[in-house]
């Protein structure tokens, strides 16, 4: 039996991003594999992040519009001849939840749904995926796991670390090693 409460407390203290008093309702559970344990930790962490709100950022978009929005890209409008259709190519910033951190979390949840975890955990992850409907899926092989965190996204540090462990099929041990999930 692995006490998930103790592991979650350890992670919350290690990352100093979570307040431990929010997790007093946890108990011990039986986990038959590490994927189940990581899925439980990720499930609880994502639920807390959803209460805070998903991280958002400004993403640059370029598309053909009939009304001016943002900056006008005249050279691209001439090349694609959108002016003949009474449209123009505009470049503008959109405040979106489709950030790299959210993409990593969504892709990891989708990967966990294919893993050998219980049906109740899969159902819980599917319910959480509903909040990530506007977020694109990415290939985790090409993710730069050495992200820099600031005050606005430091709450993602533990979640991304858990996603890294899930992707690589690792669990952190107390012995010295080369893998870091926290700077």
Predicted regions and their residues:
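Terminal, charged accessory segments of proteins
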Residues: 1-177
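Catalytic core segments in nucleotide and nucleic-acid processing enzymes
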Residues: 183
